[in-house]
Amino acid sequence: MPELPEVETVRRGLQPVMEGAKIVVAEARRPDLRFPFQPDFVARLQGQVVTGLGRRAKYLMADLASGDVLLMHLGMSGSFRVIKPDNDAAPGEFHYPRGKDTTHDHVLFRMSSGADIVFNDPRRFGYMKVIARNALEDEPLLRGLGPEPLGNEFDAAMLARSCEGKATSLKAALLDQRVVAGLGNIYVCEALHRSHLSPRRIAATLATRKGEPTDHAKRLVGAIHTVLNDAIKAGGSSLRDHRQTTGELGYFQHSFKVYDREGETCKTPACGGTIKRFTQNGRSTFWCPKCQK
């Protein structure tokens, strides 16, 4: 499933053709994706100007002039394709190869900018929903999400407060969207390695007895910022076929320190340890037992 950097790559690819443009035609070519489309889904989109395109955690959010917001999630296999008369690009296409097969083109937005934006989703785990902006706080899909890891409010003090007293593992805490929104398995593994913290470490150790952030918390927040920013600059990670707006692959997987490197030598200078993998909360965890404590 695409994580925050991949979704941000998609947002940046769609922004030039969506922001400020009108949705001239909206089509839902089947009754559902992961969830059924709302009965008025098309009617609430057609003719609306997109005033802004943002992101919350792993969700894309298109602000409409009507006061509604189009909430979009890529799911496991969803991708957007931008079709122009003189160009065909895939902004942040993730997981499935881009081809000419339109069988799984389930949603179309024809924009006044001259672009057709097509949502393709073979496995149909993605979803779209139109929500009134003043009702966003009550939306079940968004309610309870923690701070954005790249936002100004996310710092060591906030992370320490969120983890204070938690007996769960550090990795499980970071994957909890209530603690921090948008992190997934890949970037949690990478951030823990770069901060030299064990994924098995108890989350509560990020806070002192007085609730202040420890050095561990400060290192971890710095590593999260670095990993996410580096991944966004690289266009995300191409585990199968993640593409940028130019159609090029994302390249951050070439910078992985631990993820999917089981049995290989740790890249930490002077470490010399071997990357191990174990199952943690149903997911593969990659780490270096020698330098992550």
Curated annotation (Swiss-Prot):
UniProt: DNA binding residues: 104, 123, 166
Signal sequence, renumbered to the chain: none
Domain of life: Bacteria
Mapped zinc finger ranges (FPG-type): 257-293
CDD domains: EcFpg-like_N (cd08966)
Catalytic activity field: Hydrolysis of DNA containing ring-opened 7-methylguanine residues, releasing 2,6-diamino-4-hydroxy-5-(N-methyl)formamidopyrimidine; 2'-deoxyribonucleotide-(2'-deoxyribose 5'-phosphate)-2'-deoxyribonucleotide-DNA = a 3'-end 2'-deoxyribonucleotide-(2,3-dehydro-2,3-deoxyribose 5'-phosphate)-DNA + a 5'-end 5'-phospho-2'-deoxyribonucleoside-DNA + H(+)
Co-factor remark: Binds 1 zinc ion per subunit.
Annotated keywords: DNA damage, DNA repair, DNA-binding, Glycosidase, Hydrolase, Lyase, Metal-binding, Multifunctional enzyme, Zinc, Zinc-finger
GO molecular function: 8-oxo-7,8-dihydroguanine DNA N-glycosylase activity; class I DNA-(apurinic or apyrimidinic site) endonuclease activity; damaged DNA binding; DNA-(apurinic or apyrimidinic site) endonuclease activity; zinc ion binding
Keyword Metal-binding attributed: yes
PROSITE patterns hit by this protein: FPG_CAT, ZF_FPG_1, ZF_FPG_2
Positions annotated as active site in the UniProt record: 2 (schiff-base intermediate with dna), 3 (proton donor), 58 (proton donor), 283 (proton donor)
Keyword presence, DNA-binding: yes
Gene Ontology biological process terms in this record: base-excision repair
Annotated EC: 3.2.2.23, 4.2.99.18
Coiled coil (residue ranges): none
Cofactor(s), names only, from the UniProt record: Zn(2+)
SMART domains (UniProt xref): Fapy_DNA_glyco, H2TH
Complex formation: Monomer.
Biological role stated in the UniProt entry: Involved in base excision repair of DNA damaged by oxidation or by mutagenic agents. Acts as a DNA glycosylase that recognizes and removes damaged bases. Has a preference for oxidized purines, such as 7,8-dihydro-8-oxoguanine (8-oxoG). Has AP (apurinic/apyrimidinic) lyase activity and introduces nicks in the DNA strand. Cleaves the DNA backbone by beta-delta elimination to generate a single-strand break at the site of the removed base with both 3'- and 5'-phosphates.
Recorded family membership: Belongs to the FPG family.
Protein name per Swiss-Prot or TrEMBL: Formamidopyrimidine-DNA glycosylase
Species whose genome carries this gene: Bradyrhizobium diazoefficiens (strain JCM 10833 / BCRC 13528 / IAM 13628 / NBRC 14792 / USDA 110)
Gene name of the encoded protein: mutM
